[in-house]
Amino acid sequence: MFRQFYLWTCLASGIILGSLFEICLGQYDDDCKLARGGPPATIVAIDEESRNGTILVDNMLIKGTAGGPDPTIELSLKDNVDYWVLMDPVKQMLFLNSTGRVLDRDPPMNIHSIVVQVQCINKKVGTIIYHEVRIVVRDRNDNSPTFKHESYYATVNELTPVGTTIFTGFSGDNGATDIDDGPNGQIEYVIQYNPDDPTSNDTFEIPLMLTGNIVLRKRLNYEDKTRYFVIIQANDRAQNLNERRTTTTTLTVDVLDGDDLGPMFLPCVLVPNTRDCRPLTYQAAIPELRTPEELNPIIVTPPIQAIDQDRNIQPPSDRPGILYSILVGTPEDYPRFFHMHPRTAELSLLEPVNRDFHQKFDLVIKAEQDNGHPLPAFAGLHIEILDENNQSPYFTMPSYQGYILESAPVGATISDSLNLTSPLRIVALDKDIEDTKDPELHLFLNDYTSVFTVTQTGITRYLTLLQPVDREEQQTYTFSITAFDGVQESEPVIVNIQVMDANDNTPTFPEISYDVYVYTDMRPGDSVIQLTAVDADEGSNGEITYEILVGAQGDFIINKTTGLITIAPGVEMIVGRTYALTVQAADNAPPAERRNSICTVYIEVLPPNNQSPPRFPQLMYSLEISEAMRVGAVLLNLQATDREGDSITYAIENGDPQRVFNLSETTGILTLGKALDRESTDRYILIITASDGRPDGTSTATVNIVVTDVNDNAPVFDPYLPRNLSVVEEEANAFVGQVKATDPDAGINGQVHYSLGNFNNLFRITSNGSIYTAVKLNREVRDYYELVVVATDGAVHPRHSTLTLAIKVLDIDDNSPVFTNSTYTVLVEENLPAGTTILQIEAKDVDLGANVSYRIRSPEVKHFFALHPFTGELSLLRSLDYEAFPDQEASITFLVEAFDIYGTMPPGIATVTVIVKDMNDYPPVFSKRIYKGMVAPDAVKGTPITTVYAEDADPPGLPASRVRYRVDDVQFPYPASIFEVEEDSGRVITRVNLNEEPTTIFKLVVVAFDDGEPVMSSSATVKILVLHPGEIPRFTQEEYRPPPVSELATKGTMVGVISAAAINQSIVYSIVSGNEEDTFGINNITGVIYVNGPLDYETRTSYVLRVQADSLEVVLANLRVPSKSNTAKVYIEIQDENNHPPVFQKKFYIGGVSEDARMFTSVLRVKATDKDTGNYSVMAYRLIIPPIKEGKEGFVVETYTGLIKTAMLFHNMRRSYFKFQVIATDDYGKGLSGKADVLVSVVNQLDMQVIVSNVPPTLVEKKIEDLTEILDRYVQEQIPGAKVVVESIGARRHGDAFSLEDYTKCDLTVYAIDPQTNRAIDRNELFKFLDGKLLDINKDFQPYYGEGGRILEIRTPEAVTSIKKRGESLGYTEGALLALAFIIILCCIPAILVVLVSYRQFKVRQAECTKTARIQAALPAAKPAVPAPAPVAAPPPPPPPPPGAHLYEELGDSSILFLLYHFQQSRGNNSVSEDRKHQQVVMPFSSNTIEAHKSAHVDGSLKSNKLKSARKFTFLSDEDDLSAHNPLYKENISQVSTNSDISQRTDFVDPFSPKIQAKSKSLRGPREKIQRLWSQSVSLPRRLMRKVPNRPEIIDLQQWQGTRQKAENENTGICTNKRGSSNPLLTTEEANLTEKEEIRQGETLMIEGTEQLKSLSSDSSFCFPRPHFSFSTLPTVSRTVELKSEPNVISSPAECSLELSPSRPCVLHSSLSRRETPICMLPIETERNIFENFAHPPNISPSACPLPPPPPISPPSPPPAPAPLAPPPDISPFSLFCPPPSPPSIPLPLPPPTFFPLSVSTSGPPTPPLLPPFPTPLPPPPPSIPCPPPPSASFLSTECVCITGVKCTTNLMPAEKIKSSMTQLSTTTVCKTDPQREPKGILRHVKNLAELEKSVANMYSQIEKNYLRTNVSELQTMCPSEVTNMEITSEQNKGSLNNIVEGTEKQSHSQSTSL
């Protein structure tokens, strides 16, 4: 005590002195310190370019005064670089100093921050403090981005898929830069609209604006556009959009031509508005029965040619070629006759065609690229087989009549009718050709070739106009047409063309004006004048209508048809009046074409004339008559009228001198008097007079007669023109001569047309009779022609005449000399003498008078040869030497010419090749004259001895230089019989198996000869020595097989040793074969074979070497003597090593798994290969997976198959992905390893598409790998690296809700994984990728689907469709409201949780503080402990209640019972106040309860008049002390218990058993004769809750028995101890209590029930309603019994019946319901502490039957800390019954730690302990071992009920047996402790809790000893058998409670303070 006092005194003194020192210095230490909190540095921010004087810091807040009369601090700036900062020390302000400069954060200044130190000097104490000020310069967006280049350029192929990045030129430093910082300096790229190139921004896009990578947005087409100008805008990312700065550049994108178009046949005529060519058909015609040599190549019109439409593919070397072929054709046997060259498209005839069998061939030709492009072009080829030309052409009509409008333009087609509706069709056929085929005739016009022409193709020909025609000039054209087929001509056919009139002429009056006189006596209707206008047109165009326009004044009218002007009706002429009439003459053409003219008629009115002459009706008469008209025909009736009625006499006054016409004098009838001849006179103008006999009574009329022609004359040739003509050959269109014929007929009858009667193909004649050559004539073919010229008139029935002309063809020098052979080849032997003639050449010239001469054209050979100029003889100028020519074939090729000396044509040329024949100049020459060799005497046949060699000097490659060998068997016959030489190699070998004598020498003559002419040879001698057998080494074995050699063996590694022996010979070893690659070497001396080169098992697995051993003498002689003995074979096997690691087929595997996949679903299969063999190629796969939640491994892999499967469920994990590695290790997992990455993405049907095809699922499943590769390719066109994964293959589902299945079709469900995002590609995107390429995919699928197989559609899965339908049924408004509500709820839930948790924590802390304060205030003062006195008869009266007596309700019944026991134990010698210190250690919160019970009545009611609190109370298990109501308080219940409440307890105990009565008597001693009983319900039905007492009561045994009897009478369901009895409580309803209320009531109920049971009887059976468990007897009980449950069995709430017999172990076996509702009534022994056997799980806890604890031999060590607790299960009241026995099914779990030395603990969470639990966790429990049966013990059979929340007690047993049982159980049972929860409430603040628990455990042991010692006598009296079991030896009663409590107090003396 003194030491403590001293320490406390020293500590207090130090504290006081330090405080005084601090107070003294505090006022000065604060100066220079910051008056603010927070970080020591001052950080401010300022914008760049801020103005000078900007305040940086308005107050530094440094303590102290820097100005004034008495400053305490001094401020200054340090480290002020460039003096950017100024300071006002008085105001402690900092300013920006930017005088003459600008604060710029950007380059080149790069001022990002300014750091200065404010130095503060404390003037009082002299200390210096530096305060750092950091000025951060904020960036302003004052700089615009700048591009590194003015423009950028990119090229992209037109075949580039959409989505491809085509330009990355802005990456790095190549793009735009902005020297601003942060967002102001970050660049975004966007594409702007380019008005000059509007499509550029639609074609390209920048999806990632920060990178600027340009991506193709639309497909390109080189044929549409080849260049784009894309405007790229770069802008910074300033937060204010209005402040962003931009700049632009232009990216020029050139589109490269790609191979996207196929070939195209030429000529191509495009279909309008498309790029497609019209169908093209090529034409060809071949005559029948012609040989291929005559026709090949066949001429096709137009020539077959195809070009690639992609004409600008770069580089040109990549441009594909065109391949031509005949695809199909009819007839089917066309391949017999035709072949098309694949490169040139040249059509060839294979064999003659007979037209009787084949009239035509229709072929389809194909042009395709030679690179396999899938777009070929097709065209037709029509081949006509022509008949043999033995028939002349003919016309289908004898003549043709055509019509043409005279106004028709040039090129108009002649019509066949007057209405001009259809053209004139001229059909010419050839009998050699079918009528339906074009005979390809040439049609010629014999006349008017300058006016008309005829089309030259087709069966039907048409005449067209070459120049305008005029009907008025020539009304008809008549000519003939002749058809010519190349050999024969047709008969000419006459064509008559009539020119139809057009209104091209205007009516014309003869005079412009007329003067006429009229008389006053003329009457209306009298004629004034008849006007006549003339119009040369015909028909209505020539019909004239007359009209008076003006001037008539209504007095005159005109006849519209005749033009006769008469006096109008009712008009009288007035003398002197004059009229000027304007008369119009107009034709009757359509109004738009009508023509007219006018004239003026002047009329004067005169007085009347009474003697007027006769008058004709008209003054002019016109008529036409044919010259063939008969004589006497009436032509005209001329009738004149005389006003006076006088007779009139008619006469022809003029115009008919020949008297051709007759005129009747009286009648005026004009008739024909003579025959007409139009050729002599074609017009007559007759003047006819009419006279009445008076002199002035004569008038005249004019008759105009035109004589029309008839064809009565044939054309007549001019006899004076020459008929012998000549023409020069080789001139086309050369003038030959002219003929002329005349026809006196008029019109067409007199028009003469010329034509040729023959040779129309060679000559032509014009319309004027000029004859020209139609083609070039060749005199050499024909030099004379008789040409027939035909002259025909143009009548309908024409007349014609002929003329024969003699035409001679004149020769010109138009042919060159032609050699008889174009090539001459001559073989000349070398060394022929000069002047030898070696060749005669000849040439001919077909021209007349030609003189041919010869000469050598090649000057380089003129020194070898001479050519005679006239004879053509070729001779040598010198001899030729074959060896002088460098080529293998010595030849000279040159040109010779033949020319006409007097001609002008170029010379003829021929090629002469002179081949020099080698004449074998040199013989072979041996390299040696004598060769030596050695041979073994027993050498076998074929043993090589030596090799001879000869060389020939003749040029190599010629027969003269080929050297061969043979043996000369003439000189040495015997050696020649046993030896031979190989003909080509010269190797001398044995011919037979030798058996010769050693040392024999043979001579062999070898001859070398060549194959030249003549054959030349030479010889050499070979000396062969037969060796002695002893001189030939001999191998010890014929074959050597060394151990296998590792392929990793290094160079020099020994393989094996070979050994040979010889007599007195040094042996040399060598490898003679099998070592071509020099892989092995051999030591020539030792015979060690070693590795000389790299080995590779994978390349070669074994070698066979042939080794030879020779003597050194033989080797030095450069010889070898092979024999049977000195050669051997070495077989070397190569051993494979693990030198190649496994290699995966892919470096990156992509797979997917559906989120509803089951466990161990296959995901994908990986495969690795290894070049090694055997075990080294056997893989073992394993996965390296990063940690997954809850320690699960998501995937597993089959070790030897590589099949990856799922190892977990993936519910609700869509869009998750897993990345891990798969390792393949060869040699079954012990060798080298390779790895690959695996990506598995979790998907569901929202990511999938269904590909529906019309093939069965079985077929798709067989081809699924190939089909998946095709789908991969198309998806990867859009997303590189993407992988298509097949989810399922099944029958097609269709119909409503997809309920029908069609197994003839297939549903292929797929999805795709994007390796960039590691997730599934959006379902809609996948649909676009596949549906857009559906046609191409079908083409690729065709080889696998078969004929007709294809994809029908791509649709969404049925699950997605149903979701869509449900989603569509929800309106947009409702959906939006729901979404809004959902968002609000999500936002509110966290806030509510935060509030609840905060409030909960606040209430917990508040309750703990309140409880702690109350406990500390209520604890009495402690007194020293004294030994316990002997028991007394009755307890002394209790003292007055302390101030804390109201804690009774707050601490609860369990605390009261516990403290009451300690109160009674200590009343003998020590008062409660004296034991306060010890009780404070044992249970600090129980002192108030003890004092409260000191003032209690004997019946248990409190003497305090204070109202008992109904406030909420707290157990240690509670997390919220305000969460439960005090169950001991009930309103309107008396303070003192009455007997009326006894009936409420009769349901729970059975005190009438003998054991219970005996026990109750023994327990009623002098100290206490009353038992206290509390009852509390846990989750009871409402019916039973009324019977549960709410207040603590004290009743005696008789009251209890009476209450029980009453309950029995009411049949309240007391359960007997018989197993299997029914319990009425099982049918009751369950009360609605919260879990916490259930737990709290259960805790109280268990404590009360256990006390009552123990007070009634410790050896009787007692049964309560309880959960359904299986029970059996426990083995010998140790301190703890492990209770371990199966995974499906909750081991917390359990009860077991313990019999003290080894045959019934107590185990747990139950499945529990939601709630626990046990009802427990236990008698409570007031004289005994039964609480040491209790543990208190928080929610549910099974109990085991504990035994009384033995006294501890030594203080126990601290028990292990509890592990975390499991959540409690629920217990249903319907699972309760009295426990039947059953064998244990599971090991017992380890109970939680308890403070009692001996207990049967429970598993599961503990209930609140009476003392604090251990705060530290338990170590891992040892493995559980089943408990074997213990040794037999004579225990009394006692049944105990284990009730939830408590531990059952049982009868005491002898200490020896207890000890033995403990020992046995501890050695045979390994107990496992279930985790406990951490301490709650005030126990969390208890320090040294482990030591405290240890001390309390010792204290309980001492208390138990004292109790047993005082009650053993009574127990022996009342229950001897029990007393025997309850004896305890005196050795166990060691130790003192006071000592234990004192030691505990020293260890935790400050616990109350801490609390």
From Swiss-Prot:
Keywords: Calcium, Cell adhesion, Cell membrane, Deafness, Disease variant, Disulfide bond, Glycoprotein, Hearing, Membrane, Non-syndromic deafness, Repeat, Retinitis pigmentosa, Secreted, Signal, Transmembrane, Transmembrane helix, Usher syndrome. Residues 1-26 form the signal peptide. One of its GO terms (molecular function) is calcium ion binding. The chain crosses the membrane at residues 1377-1397. It is found in: Cell membrane. Residues 1398-1955 are cytoplasmic. PROSITE patterns: CADHERIN_1, CADHERIN_2. The keyword NADP does not apply. Glycans are attached at N52, N97, N201, N419, N559, N662, N724, N768, N821, N851, N1064, N1084, N1175. Residues 40-147, 148-265, 278-395, 396-509, 510-616, 617-717, 719-819, 820-926, 927-1035, 1037-1144, 1145-1259 form the Cadherin domain. The keyword Chaperone does not apply. CDD domains: Cadherin_repeat. Disulfide bonds join C32-C120. It is a single-pass type I membrane protein. InterPro entries: Cadherin-domain_protein, Cadherin-like_dom, Cadherin-like_sf, Cadherin_CS, EC_dom, EC_dom_sf, PCDH15_12th_dom. It comes from the Eukaryota. Expressed in brain, lung, kidney, spleen and testis. Found also in the inner and outer synaptic layers, and the nerve fiber layer in adult and fetal retinas. Found in the supporting cells, outer sulcus cells and spiral ganglion of fetal cochlea. Expressed in cytotoxic tumor-derived T- and NK-cell lines as well as biopsies of nasal NK/T-cell lymphomas. Not detected in normal or in vitro activated peripheral blood cells, CD4 or CD8 lymphocytes or NK cells. Isoform 3 is expressed in brain, heart, cerebellum and kidney. Residues 27-1376 are extracellular. PANTHER family: DESMOGLEIN FAMILY MEMBER, NEURAL-CADHERIN. It is linked to Usher syndrome 1F: USH is a genetically heterogeneous condition characterized by the association of retinitis pigmentosa with sensorineural deafness. Age at onset and differences in auditory and vestibular function distinguish Usher syndrome type 1 (USH1), Usher syndrome type 2 (USH2) and Usher syndrome type 3 (USH3). USH1 is characterized by profound congenital sensorineural deafness, absent vestibular function and prepubertal onset of progressive retinitis pigmentosa leading to blindness. Usher syndrome 1D/F: A digenic recessive form of Usher syndrome, a genetically heterogeneous condition characterized by the association of retinitis pigmentosa with sensorineural deafness. Age at onset and differences in auditory and vestibular function distinguish Usher syndrome type 1 (USH1), Usher syndrome type 2 (USH2) and Usher syndrome type 3 (USH3). USH1 is characterized by profound congenital sensorineural deafness, absent vestibular function and prepubertal onset of progressive retinitis pigmentosa leading to blindness. Antiparallel heterodimer with CDH23. Found in a complex with TMIE and LHFPL5. Interacts with LHFPL5/TMHS; this interaction is required for efficient localization to hair bundles. Interacts with MYO7A. Interacts with USH1G; this interaction may recruit USH1G to the plasma membrane. Interacts with TOMT. Isoforms CD1 and CD3 interact with TMC1 (via N-terminus) and TMC2 (via N-terminus). Cadherin repeats 1 and 2 mediate calcium-dependent heterophilic interaction with CDH23. Three calcium ions are usually bound at the interface of each cadherin domain and rigidify the connections, imparting a strong curvature to the full-length ectodomain. This is Protocadherin-15. It comes from Homo sapiens (Human). The gene is PCDH15.
